[in-house]
Amino acid sequence: MNAQVETPQTKNSDAAALRSAEFSRILLIKPSALGDVVHTLPVLVKLRARYPQAGIDWLITPENAEVVRNHPALSNVILFARRDFSKRGHRWRAFLSFFDLLKQIRRAKYDLVIDMHGQVRSAFFALISGARVRIGFNRPIKRTLTVSAEHDLKNVPSHGWRGAREGSWIAYTHRIPIPTLDVHAIDRYLWVGELLGFDDNPPDLTIHLSPETVRNVERLLKEKGVDVSQPLVVLVPGTIWETKHWTIEGFAGVARHFLREGFAVALAGTKRDEPRCRQIAAAAPGTCDLSGKTTPADLAGLIRRAEVAVTNDSGSMHVAASLGKPMVSVFGPTNPVHIGPYERPESVVRVDLPCSPCNYRRLSQCPFGHACMKQVTSAMVVERVQKILSTAKTKAETADCVSR
């Protein structure tokens, strides 16, 4: 089963051989970010179903490892401490750790490596593994008009994901063809199943949390005076892109509404989000601010504890979707068809502007004063949350009646 690296996709005979092949040592590469890690969970589940006896490891950053570590389909996590390279005084130690990581990957003798990250660094990990089969996405294709029954989008950004980047496709023995860009990231990742012979079962995004994580979340809430029986709304106002931030007043308005309704309201985020969360908490007295106090796994535990989560387009949105929780996400510069909550278009709130989505990351790039986010009001979000909670309550009552 030797494929030619230079071929853009596998030949028919080789594809059939690959689908019928068995592998005993598998490495899945998707270090970050949180949302992308969640998107990769269905690939892990289908790998386990396809190769039930194989050892399946995941190369991932330490901060995201706890989100996947307890997954029953996973054998082991391989930690890539990427952030150490940017810490002063830690770079020499980071380089030593990096070489140790390369040796660890090489010694594992993987026979199948799947690179879902598609950058030069992740491709290097795939290449250094020495695996006889290395799979990743093909080179970028041309972007075309987005057509979707779920969202009517009037703008097609000229940039964004179009395939493997930075020449990473050169490292792969088999490349995943890219027939279209008009597809959600989860479905795109599952295209690897065409090469490996995955089953046709619906994608399983379930996050498996440890009992320790659940206890830690309850401790954090108790310290803030939230009773275990009190209904909880979680607001996650952070995101990496400047343009994906909904307004401070928008989140504060949502918080004030649900505080009046008798809910506990918790803010969650990383240390980077602390200034934003402090402003929201100040504008909505009674809100408990947990920003900077939770890991990604704690965030998942907090959202699982909640009645509903309200987010930007961020990893927290995908965590909420994976947990099956009622949630609402505010979208502006990005495309909900590609990276929205999976198969939950009703959870997206956005205004219909001809410039959206644009995929601009910085506010300085926007010539319209961030209109796509500023025009989304707290009343719009509250109305959508109430509708989703009402629908969830009706479904739960119906299921309860059926089970009796």
Predicted regions and their residues:
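Catalytic machinery of carbohydrate-active enzymes
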Residues: 1-404
